[in-house]
Amino acid sequence: MIMKKSAFMLLIILLSLTANAQTPYHNEDGKKIDKEELETKDYLPEIHGTIRTKFEYQTEMAASRFEVRNARISITGNVLPIVAYKAEIDLSDEGQIKMLDAYARLFPIKDLTVTAGQMRVPFTIDAHRSPHQQYFANRSFIAKQVGNVRDVGVTLGYKFGTGIPVTLEGGLYNGSGLTNQKEWHKEVNYSAKAQFLFAKKLNLALSIQSIQPQEVRINSYDIGAFYEFGRFHIEGEYLYKTYADNAYDNVHAVNSFINYDLPLQKVFSKMSFLARYDMMTSQSDGKAINEETGALTTTDYKRHRITGGITFSLSKAFRTDLRLNYEKYFYAKN
């Protein structure tokens, strides 16, 4: 292995947050409605937004760039106490406009949810984090390359347990992503996730996913956990991916990091110190095929990365973070 590149990044995140009421009916972002004391404002939509701007300097190339990584706007609300909705669009995902979420969510009985539409499927820990929830300037390889899946379908969610709260999620999906929604499918594409919260500090997540983007079925398995104590957050995740009929080599991906928060009194509310190691072996998305041989081709090559960073947080009511990250990538010689 040789060191291939390193980068210095400056990232500013602006997030608009809204306050929550205190009643048993929820919309996608946690708004609660008192069914017995409905008010007109209960049905007013809420607007949320995230802007991420980034400056990168590539030391090996001695080159730099500015980028609007995200400019997300979402609308959430309720049309009935047990019917919520969400629509989210990114006006600048590295310069491209993307429709991310568009779904309705039902709360038929206590602790049960039914979500139908376009959404992120229940799989992995890190891939489920929105931009404002991420710890680093760049997402992990699991969150961006290996386990990042949005699709159209239906998801069921159920929560139970008091001593050890458990959240179960599972659903059926097209399996062809966001753009090919008119295609008919004979194969079954599914994803499921179970989360266990031990002592309110240790979270264990188990996930499984099976999709068939083209001719080859791809099965993925993920296990991850994070532990929070004092000012520390420690997290680790492992993903394993296989291809039917040995159409491509099995894929391994790892994400591990630690975060320490230091409260501050002036200017910044806190300063966070972070360190991360993540890696992935070469993978195919199941769509790229060699025209001559018909075999799957590589879409993402094997790599390792070490990241160190400091995050300065300005506000609690409106989350505003200034992230300074230094990354080193390691690629194979060939």
Explain the meaning of each model-derived region:
Residues N180-W184:
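Active-site cleft segment of glycoside hydrolase catalytic domains centered on the general acid/base Glu
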Residues P24-H26, T59-M61, L80, Y103-F107, ...:
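Outer-membrane beta-barrel pore domains
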Residues M1-K31:
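Cleavable N-terminal export/targeting peptides
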Residues M3-K4, A19, K31, T53, ...:
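Generic cytosolic/nucleocytoplasmic N-terminal low-complexity/intrinsically disordered segments
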Residues K35-G175, K186-V188, Q195-N203, F257, ...:
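Outer membrane beta-barrel
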Residues T53, L172-S176, L239-Y240, Y326-K328:
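Short, histidine-centered active-site or binding-site loop motifs used for metal coordination
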Residues K5-S6, M119, Y277, L324:
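Hydrophobic alpha-helical segments, especially transmembrane helices
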